[in-house]
């Protein structure tokens, strides 16, 4: 994506309004938008363009209809245009987004394609409505359809819905992840997808899912689902994740509270309280380790060890294996009772 001619000094640039965000989605895709320019929204930080969200933003349905999905992926490899910069949400929230694909495409979300160098950090999305009127998309999600980059500190909160008769593969944070999703969460997503499989964090994972959680999502009206991830592909990782109180399962309990299907991957340090289903529904050439069930009332696992201690102790013991990553700490919350915070 074209991010040339951007100021390199930090002069208060950023995205403040819904109109700003709409303009940003056009400009970052290389399209003109009135007399606006990308230099209004970003600065160069360590030779990388960073765009800032300066406020919480509430969207109207009319404003949502004018948004462009950021990035485009073509399976042929031609005309790919992924997000390669950094969007720093600064812990602000986008409210009342309505996401709807407008054509057949490989992947669709707020960011359809985040490429290898791309970063989305510290962004909250609350009360989002995702619907598909009949278009064919291979991967669909709320935040990023196809992630090859880094998603960190991003959270889906509030009351959220995901609907569409044509949807086949759906995720909360990502549709397919080939990069790293770390320190992220998905809460209260009602997946009304009778012909689809779904997951709270990432539908398909070829990369890393680290230090994430899913809370109170409803998968009742799906074919089969996984709380954190639907399918873990060969050599992928899911580590130090937990799920809290799944609202409903697909028929015949075709549900893994952490993962639905795993194939020659690493699953380590996972906790769940849905005791009437499996943590990992189906394993192939995979031996999950340090998988715990816990009591949702006391938030303790085996031998009365607090869940929060298991999660934070894993970081203390293993963060040095990921020197380029920043792990947010687990702290006590309300609902869900354990959340993430950068300290």
Segments (PLM) and residue ranges:
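Surface-exposed repetitive/solenoidal architectures
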Residues: 1-343
């Amino acid at each position: 994506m074209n991010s040339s001619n951007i100021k390199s000094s930090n002069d208060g640039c950023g995205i403040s309004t819904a109109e700003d965000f709409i303009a940003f989605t056009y400009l970052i895709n290389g399209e003109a938008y009135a007399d606006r320019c990308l230099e209004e929204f970003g600065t160069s930080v360590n030779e990388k363009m960073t765009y800032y969200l300066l406020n919480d933003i509430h969207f109207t349905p009319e404003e949502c209809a004018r948004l462009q999905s950021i990035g485009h992926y073509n399976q042929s490899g031609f005309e790919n245009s992924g997000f390669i910069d950094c969007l720093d949400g600064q812990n602000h929230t986008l409210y009342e987004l309505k996401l709807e694909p407008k054509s057949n495409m490989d992947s669709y979300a707020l960011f359809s394609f985040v490429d290898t160098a791309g970063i989305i950090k510290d962004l909250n999305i609350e009360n989002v409505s995702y619907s598909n009127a009949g278009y064919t998309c291979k991967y669909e999600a709320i935040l990023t359809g196809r992630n090859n980059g880094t998603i960190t500190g991003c959270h889906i909160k509030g009351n959220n819905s995901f609907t569409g008769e044509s949807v086949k593969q759906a995720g909360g944070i990502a549709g397919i992840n080939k990069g790293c999703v770390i320190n992220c969460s998905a809460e209260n997503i009602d997946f009304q997808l009778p012909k689809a499989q779904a997951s709270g964090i990432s539908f398909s994972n070829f990369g890393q899912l680290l230090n994430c959680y899913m809370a109170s999502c409803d998968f009742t009206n799906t074919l089969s689902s996984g709380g954190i991830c639907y399918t873990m592909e060969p050599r992928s990782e899911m580590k130090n994740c937990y799920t809290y109180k799944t609202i409903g399962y697909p028929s015949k309990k075709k549900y893994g509270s952490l993962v639905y299907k795993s194939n020659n991957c690493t699953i380590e340090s996972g906790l769940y309280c849905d005791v009437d289903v499996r943590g990992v529904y189906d394993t192939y050439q995979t031996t999950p380790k340090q998988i715990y069930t816990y009591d949702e009332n006391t938030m303790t696992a085996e031998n009365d060890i607090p869940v929060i201690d298991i999660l934070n102790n894993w970081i203390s013991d293993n963060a040095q294996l990921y020197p380029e990553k920043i792990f947010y700490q687990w702290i006590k919350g309300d609902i869900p009772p354990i959340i993430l915070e950068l300290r």
